[in-house]
Design a protein with these regions (language model features):
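Membrane-interface starts of transmembrane alpha-helices
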Residues: 28-32
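Conserved catalytic-loop position in the HRD/HxD motif
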Residues: 25
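C-terminal peripheral helix-coil segments that are non-catalytic and often amphipathic
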Residues: 3-19, 34-77
Length: 77
């Protein structure tokens, strides 16, 4: 199951590289692993993120969105 998710993410990244959305010097597997890691880390630690970031219950997803946007802005054209 995890392999299917990783394969899907890698294919999305490959398409994004092909259409010029992501820098062409990126390795699709590395980008996919990084995105997956950010998402998994969030779900493993969301209670602590809420406490440390002083987010109200249910608004800690803002952290995930900002973390993903920060990473994606560093690899996109």
């Amino acid at each position: 199951r995890l392999y299917k998710i990783h394969k899907f993410m890698s294919e999305l990244v490959t398409e994004a590289i092909a259409d010029g959305s992501i820098h062409n010097n990126m390795q699709p597997t590395h980008v996919a692993f990084t995105l997956e890691s950010i998402i998994v880390f969030f779900f493993l630690t969301h209670d602590q993120i809420r406490d440390l970031g002083h987010f109200e219950n249910g608004t800690e997803s803002t952290y995930l969105e900002e973390a993903l946007n920060t990473y994606l802005s560093s690899i996109t054209n």
